Swiss-Prot record:
It is an enzyme of class 4 (lyase). The tRNA splicing endonuclease complex is present with 100 molecules/cell. Belongs to the tRNA-intron endonuclease family. The gene is SEN34. Constitutes one of the two catalytic subunit of the tRNA-splicing endonuclease complex, a complex responsible for identification and cleavage of the splice sites in pre-tRNA. It cleaves pre-tRNA at the 5'- and 3'-splice sites to release the intron. The products are an intron and two tRNA half-molecules bearing 2',3'-cyclic phosphate and 5'-OH termini. There are no conserved sequences at the splice sites, but the intron is invariably located at the same site in the gene, placing the splice sites an invariant distance from the constant structural features of the tRNA body. InterPro entries: tRNA_endonuc-like_dom_sf, tRNA_intron_Endo_cat-like_sf, tRNA_intron_Endonuc_cat-like, tRNA_splic, tRNA_splic_SEN34. It catalyses: pretRNA = a 3'-half-tRNA molecule with a 5'-OH end + a 5'-half-tRNA molecule with a 2',3'-cyclic phosphate end + an intron with a 2',3'-cyclic phosphate and a 5'-hydroxyl terminus. One of its GO terms (molecular function) is tRNA-intron endonuclease activity. It is a peripheral membrane protein. This is tRNA-splicing endonuclease subunit SEN34. It comes from Saccharomyces cerevisiae (strain ATCC 204508 / S288c). Gene3D superfamilies: 3.40.1350.10. NCBIfam families: endA. The lineage of its organism: Eukaryota, Fungi, Dikarya, Ascomycota, Saccharomycotina. It holds the Pfam family tRNA_int_endo.
Length: 275
């Protein structure tokens, strides 16, 4: 399961730290909603490592499959949650009805249809003649919470793990993929003030922005780290990057970590025909 963030306030805080992620919440049965994605926010593994190593996040590891967790909690608390939701809906609808009726009375007073001497029976007749009750019922809405009531009950396995254990588990995925140095590329770019996002659609590991992606264009497509002293550049990958990068005016950036000095170095390839 990829790293996920479900809380809106946490997502706002992450953006201040230069981590934007990708919104992935959608309605599977309503394809038109895919344009307006919502929580959870899916992070890259590098984002989680950076947050964890800088003491900016409390990482919770869930070993069970999500479907099994949800099924167990739903069976255990389904009836209770249903009652809570219905009670909250009824209270919300009651408040909305009162607010709409008070608003309607204020408008009638403003245009002179009623005054302080108008009786409740007269007001009721006015409501019936104008179908006001039907209009109020049709305007009621359901307020959807930003956080899940069920996710709070998920029991994580990280309570018994030390900070070093969590770091080892996070780095283990990198060691298995043989791309341990890629995180050091990520860290070096973050240290230089870049904001990084997944770069798969442009043929890279990351795309790098000089600031907030809503304000700046990305000119860099970052590739996986390589041992540039001994490992050749994959020409097929470079050609693919050229085809994708030329259209959107992006440099093709490769880099790696020098074994002797442990310094991170970057090299860029700019395509002819920009503009």
């Amino acid at each position: 399961m990829p790293p996920l963030v479900f809380d809106i306030d946490h997502i706002k805080l992450l953006r201040k730290w230069g981590i934007c992620g990708v919104l992935s919440g959608t309605l599977p049965t309503a394809a038109q909603q895919n344009v307006f994605l919502s929580v959870p926010l899916r992070l890259m593994l590098e984002d989680v490592l950076w947050l964890h190593l800088n003491n900016l996040a409390d990482v919770k590891l869930i070993r069970q499959e999500g479907d099994e967790i949800m099924e167990g909690i739903t069976l255990e608390r389904g009836a209770k949650l249903s009652k809570i939701v219905n009670d909250r809906l009824n209270k919300s609808f009651e408040y909305q009805r009162k607010f709409k009726k008070d608003e309607h009375i204020a408008k009638l007073k403003k245009i002179g249809r009623i005054n302080d001497k108008t009786t409740a029976e007269e007001l009721q007749r006015l409501d019936k003649s104008s179908n006001n009750d039907q209009l109020i019922e049709s305007s009621l809405f359901i307020d959807i919470a930003n956080t899940s009531m069920i996710l709070r009950d998920i029991r994580s396995d990280s309570d018994s793990l030390s900070r070093d254990d969590i770091s080892d588990l996070l780095f283990k995925q990198y060691r298995q993929a043989g791309k341990m140095q890629t995180y050091f590329l990520y860290k070096a770019l973050r240290d230089q003030g870049y904001v990084l996002s997944p770069g798969g659609r442009f043929g890279g590991k990351f795309i790098a922005y000089p600031g907030d992606p809503l304000r700046f264009h990305s000119h860099l497509t970052i590739q996986d780290a390589i041992d540039y002293h001994n490992e050749p550049i994959d020409l097929i990958s470079m050609i693919s990057g050229a085809r994708l990068g030329t259209t959107v005016k992006k440099l093709w950036v490769i880099g790696g970590v020098a074994e002797e000095t442990k310094e991170t170095h970057f090299f860029s390839i700019e395509w002819a025909g920009f503009g």
